[in-house]
Amino acid sequence: GHSFEQAVANLFRNIGYTAEVSNRGGDGGIDIILEKAGRKIAVQCKRYKSSVGPHVIRDLWGTMHNLGYDEGCIVTTTGFTKGVIDFAKDKNIYLIDLNDILRSTSNGGEFYLRNRLGDR
């Protein structure tokens, strides 16, 4: 639901991003738009019962190009399949599992998040 997206957006705000939760219209499934220091990142939030599969990341990759995003990010609660992890390797797509954030105790997972997004 929408509260999930809001919670994720707040995590990014905590590390200095502006995060705009999009209202589901013609945005190619983008849930949150992040901006910081000239970077613009398209975020999709997935609350699945099982791991996020390759079709999700392929769709995001296409959407990023169509809408002119340099970077993308998928946030989930259930992890990612190997296919997704491989696909993301050489692309500017960051994979974030919320469970890892909850597990990483350092300042509420902020260090982990910054790391995942390649923040300097």
Where is each model-derived feature located?
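Mixed-charge (Asp/Glu-Lys/Arg
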Residues: 1-120
